[in-house]
């Protein structure tokens, strides 16, 4: 995916999510270190029971399936988002989001 295009795609997520070194929980949890993170793992965020019980470890495949249709992947999620259907946009969004480590720093390539 294209990181710059993914950064632009992330504008759809910014109403509820932050990412990067100053990221904080908002309507949704901050997304630093998402690649390999377990669902329901961010301290101080009140997840839905469905999300906590989902047992997801976020990988590229899990992320794309979820972002395409959150309520189909995790029935009962409180994430209110219609989803992103275009594979190219999902590729770019994952390229952007997955580059941040748990401290919000861009990982060395």
Curated annotation (Swiss-Prot):
The keyword Signal does not apply. Keywords: Electron transport, Heme, Iron, Metal-binding, Transport. It holds the Pfam family Cytochrom_C. Heme c binds at residues 13, 16-17, 79. This is Cytochrome c-550. One of its GO terms (molecular function) is electron transfer activity. Binds 1 heme c group covalently per subunit. InterPro entries: Cyt_c-like_dom, Cyt_c-like_dom_sf, Cyt_c_1A/1B. Gene3D superfamilies: Cytochrome c-like domain (1.10.760.10). SUPFAM superfamilies: Cytochrome c (SSF46626). It comes from Nitrobacter winogradskyi. PANTHER family: CYTOCHROME C.
